[in-house]
Amino acid sequence: MIRQVCPDRVVCPSPERNYARAGVSHPDHRAVGSAALDAVYPDARNPFAFPELRDQEGLAPWKVREVWIAGSPSATHFVDVTATFGRKIAALRAHESQIGHADDLEERIRGWLTRAAALGGLPEGRLAEAFQVLDTQG
């Protein structure tokens, strides 16, 4: 997919356990994070990996500029999401099989995002998502 879409940025969950926020360390989420990082480097940029993609489908190797890792225990970049908080909660609530039982969902998420905003130096009352940003150009 990376060779088809040719993104400059890939956003994925962290493959690492985050002991401060156990919920973001779900095994499925960590597996997706690991697979995404493996796809970005080395596979997508390597002309010798999956040569059939190049030869049969015309998909040239692609070098993703950066990866933003969500839920990382080593977050270094903070994005103000205050204006979209309601949409985030609505999207999470649509995932009923996983979230339907969480009566405290909005409060819990607001707490995480408030702490992230404070860590990122945002003004009081703001909410932020936290990411570890990897430069993948090297």
PLM ranges: what are they?
Residues 1-138:
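Metal-dependent de-N-acetylase/amidase catalytic core
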